[in-house]
Every structure is written in C-alpha cells, then in structure tokens.
Amino acid sequence: MKIANSITELIGNTPLVKLNRLTEGLKAEVAVKLEFFNPGSSVKDRIAEAMIEGAEKAGKINKNTVIVEATSGNTGVGLAMVCAARGYKLAITMPESMSKERKMLLRAFGAELILTPAAEGMAGAIAKAKSLVDAHPDTYFMPRQFDNEANPEVHRKTTAEEIWRDTDGKVDVFVAGVGTGGTITGVGEVLKKYKPEVKVVAVEPEASPVLSGGEKGPHPIQGIGAGFIPTVLNTKIYDSITKVSNEAAFETARAIAEKEGILVGISSGAAVWSALQLAKQPENEGKLIVVLLPSYGERYLSTPLFADLA
C-alpha cells in the first residue's frame, strides 16, 4: 500500500517546471523548482524536519521540551507541522511585520506566537528566542536555523540531488534567494562538486544589501535579506549577487501567476527576476538556469503583493 506513516514522509522531491511565456525571446531556458509542493507549502519543511530529527538523535529534546525558534514565517510553519506530527510544544518568535496568513497558520498548528518589533528585524526575533532559552535552559530548546548545520546538510542530501537528477546533470546556473543561506550553501556545494563550472547566483533585497557589503535596512521581501551574514552561509559558494528592488520582486511574482499559472511568494518573484536578467545575457545562450521558488503565493494574500485584489 502507498500510505505514508507521517506527513513528514511527504517532504521533498518537489517538481521542476519550465517557464514559457515569461522567457519568450530570451537566450536561456529557465526552470523553477516548486517548493510549495512540500506538505507545509514551503522549502522550510526540509530544514524543520532535519533540525528536529537531529535534535532527537542527539538526545537534546524530549516530550517535555518546548521548542522555540526565531523565524520570518515559513520555517515556523514547517516546525509547527513537524512538531504537531511528533507531539512537541512549539513557541515561535517573529517580527510583527510578517504576513497575517503566516501568523494564523502557526496558531492553526498549535504553536505559541511571540511577536517582536518590526524595526528590530530578524535580529530582534532571534534575541527574544535566545532570552527564553537562557532563562529556561532545561525547558526550552532552540534549533537555531541560522547556525544549525542540519540546515545546509538537508539541502546537500535532498534539494541538490533532486535538481541534479531531474535535470540529468544539465543545470548550468542555480539561482536562490538568501535568508538563512542554507539552500544556496547546500545546493551550491553539491552542484559545483558534480559540475565545477555551474554558476551559483545569490539574490538579496536592494534595500538590505548586506551580502554585497551594504547596510541592512527594512524591506518587504519576506524570507530573504535577514540583515546579517548567517553562520551557515558559505559566502564562497556563490559566483555573483543580484540585488532586487521591492518593485521588481512584487511585479515579477504577480507576472509568474498571471503568465505561467504559478502562484508564488515575494521572494520567489525576486529570484525569478534575477534569473530573467541572467537569461537575457549572451553568455548564457542555450544554458539551463534553475531557480528555487521557496513558497506558495496564497500565504501572501494579505500582503501588498496581492492586497489590491480584494
């Protein structure tokens, strides 16, 4: 019988789909990896399961442990799903500016939500989570997605291998937004190991260009541009960085839905905008550009991305 023992067994093996109308007249082929096919509707399901599994194997958590994590949303949803399935209590700290849908989803899975000031960004959410662990070290466990090696490792073992397998090794360029840095690190390292000439492109908000050496700043591209260089990010793995404006990210996310029938979030818009610029360049003629799209657009209906549709 083809019956999964748990919802977490359905994480991974997400599909690749070619963009058609958005790439008309461009020199390269662009394929997008749809991470919203994961059961929690985002790429973060992968690291949520990996971090909880790692903590279980290391004996760091038990049924009395309260798992606490700082997250801009999708990691929280992934953790909430995994914790619900495995019977753990979960508390999530997140900036108050995150979308209404994400907050409701977390509560729907039974997670406790602790909101921090928007102006403090992810750094404020992380500080709050750490303060809870420091105050109750025997009760709280923090997976620390920005520092946890299980984050890039699950992308080495799963995401990268899926891309290599599904493109028959023909991938030439990999594009991903950088939040924790786990995806671009894990996927980039493996693809370059298999095919050293693969180019890896990091995407960050123009309004918070920390990877490019600029100043951090507030921006609406949820999930990327944390405002600091995460521990798990291998800053040597990407060949170039694309800075994307808020407007370009929003417009491209809307265009993906309207022209390709693929409903995605804001950071997916940023990543595809970057890929489309690359696809225009003569040196990429005939090449295959793979773009990771982290999450589903329905999670952003209350944000400025789709707010004017109401």
Curated annotation (Swiss-Prot):
Looking up NCBIfam families in the UniProt record yields: cysK (TIGR01139), cysKM (TIGR01136)
Phylogenetic placement of the source organism: Bacteria, Pseudomonadati, Pseudomonadota, Betaproteobacteria, Neisseriales
Provide the transmembrane region boundaries.
Answer: none
Catalysed reaction, written as an equation: O-acetyl-L-serine + hydrogen sulfide = L-cysteine + acetate
Identify the GO cellular component terms for this protein.
Answer: cytoplasm
**Superkingdom in the source lineage:** Bacteria
Q: What else is known?
A: Present in outer membrane vesicle formulations which are used as vaccines in human.
InterPro entries per the UniProt record, alphabetical: Cys_synth (IPR005856), Cys_Synth/Cystath_Beta-Synth (IPR050214), CysK (IPR005859), P-phosphate_BS (IPR001216), TrpB-like_PALP (IPR001926), TrpB-like_PALP_sf (IPR036052)
Pathway entry: Amino-acid biosynthesis; L-cysteine biosynthesis; L-cysteine from L-serine: step 2/2
**What GO terms are given for molecular function?**
cysteine synthase activity; L-cysteine desulfhydrase activity
Q: Which PROSITE patterns match?
A: CYS_SYNTHASE
- Residues recorded with modification N6-(pyridoxal phosphate)lysine: 44
Taxonomic source organism: Neisseria meningitidis serogroup B (strain ATCC BAA-335 / MC58)
Could you tell me the EC number(s) of this protein? 2.5.1.47
Q: Which annotated residues bind pyridoxal 5'-phosphate?
A: 74, 179-183, 267
Q: What biological process terms from GO does the record include?
A: cysteine biosynthetic process from serine
Q: Which cofactor does it need?
A: pyridoxal 5'-phosphate
Broad enzyme group: transferase
Record's protein name: Cysteine synthase
Which family does the record assign?
Answer: Belongs to the cysteine synthase/cystathionine beta-synthase family.
Q: Which Pfam families match?
A: PALP
CDD domains for this protein: CBS_like
Q: Which keywords appear in this protein's UniProt record, sorted alphabetically?
A: Amino-acid biosynthesis, Cysteine biosynthesis, Pyridoxal phosphate, Transferase
